[in-house]
Regions:
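Non-catalytic C-terminal interaction segments of nucleic acid-processing enzymes
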Residues: 58, 62-77, 81-135
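Active-site metal-binding core of divalent-cation-utilizing nuclease and nuclease-like domains
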Residues: 2-64, 129-130
Length: 135
C-alpha cells in the first residue's frame, strides 16, 4: 500500500469525523474510474460536487494545471491537501489558481498535517467536534 493510499484513507476518516459524512457519501478515484474514459483525470475523493485531491509529490506544472482545470470544469469546488514541507506544490497550485482566475471560494489549498491534527482532536466515538464547512 502506498503513502498516497494511506493519506486518502486518513482524509476519508477526517471527513467522517469532522464533517459527519458517511463513507457512502464519498467516491474514490477507483470508483470513478469505472465511469470515466481512460486517461481522464479523476480526483482522489469526490464528496457531492466537491473534488478533493491529496498531492504528496511534485508534478509538472502542466499536469497540475490540467488537473486543476478538469476539476474546475467538472466540480463546484476543489480542495488540495498538501504536506507542509511541499511548499513548491502549494506555490504551483496558487499560481495556477491565479493564472486561470479560479476563485478563492471554489479552490482551497490545505495543509495535510492540519487534517491529521484535526482528526487526532476528534472524539470519533461520538463526533463531538464539528469543523467549519468546506467550500
Amino acid at each position: 500500500m502506498t503513502n498516497h493510499c494511506l493519506e486518502v484513507g486518513i482524509v476519508c476518516a477526517w471527513l467522517r469525523a469532522t464533517r459527519k459524512l458517511h463513507f457512502s457519501d464519498m467516491m474514490l478515484d477507483m470508483q470513478l474510474r469505472e465511469s470515466q474514459a481512460v486517461g481522464e483525470h479523476r480526483p482522489d475523493i469526490v464528496v457531492g460536487n466537491l473534488a478533493i485531491e491529496v498531492e504528496l509529490n511534485h508534478k509538472r506544472k502542466e499536469t497540475l494545471t490540467r488537473n486543476v482545470l478538469s476539476n474546475e470544469l467538472n466540480y463546484d469546488g476543489q480542495v488540495w491537501l498538501v504536506p507542509q514541507r511541499k511548499a513548491n506544490i502549494r506555490r504551483s497550485l496558487a499560481e495556477i489558481f491565479s493564472d486561470n482566475v479560479i476563485e478563492d471560494e471554489t479552490a482551497k489549498i490545505l495543509c495535510l498535517e492540519d487534517i491529521h491534527q484535526e482528526l487526532c482532536l476528534c472524539n470519533i466515538h461520538n463526533n463531538t467536534w464539528q469543523a467549519p464547512p468546506l467550500p
